Amino acid sequence: MVQQESRLKVADNTGAKELLVIRVMGGSTRRYANIGDVIVATVKDATPGGVVKKGDVVKAVVVRSVKGARRKDGSYIKFDENAAVIIKDDKTPKGTRIFGPVARELREKQFMKIVSLAPEVL
């Protein structure tokens, strides 16, 4: 489960490598984030010369989760890591590339640009 203080891998080319979750968006009592949920996070590790720097506060969407998500047909989708993509305020990614597979649930939550950039949608 992704919650406050969780650390996530960054699955794009913005220059950030790791994020620390500050808040899960969606109300003051919202505790956990799953695939397709927006979070506010800070950059804990970044490569030099990237778009974002260490210490920047960013919005991101969770694209892979170890806990996984239940689908309408009863199946589950789970991943080996928790990963997020840094986004702008209009739900478009800050980076120009997405690394690794993303879940189909992002299409239902209207993150079309992330889905189109991803190399694989599971």
Curated annotation (Swiss-Prot):
Pfam families: Ribosomal_L14. SUPFAM superfamilies: Ribosomal protein L14 (SSF50193). Signal peptide: none annotated. The keyword DNA-binding does not apply. Disulfide bonds: none annotated. The keyword Metal-binding does not apply. One of its GO terms (cellular component) is cytosolic large ribosomal subunit. Coiled coil: none annotated. One of its GO terms (molecular function) is large ribosomal subunit rRNA binding. NCBIfam families: rplN_bact. Binds to 23S rRNA. Forms part of two intersubunit bridges in the 70S ribosome. PANTHER family: 50S/60S RIBOSOMAL PROTEIN L14/L23, LARGE RIBOSOMAL SUBUNIT PROTEIN UL14M. This is Large ribosomal subunit protein uL14. The gene is rplN.
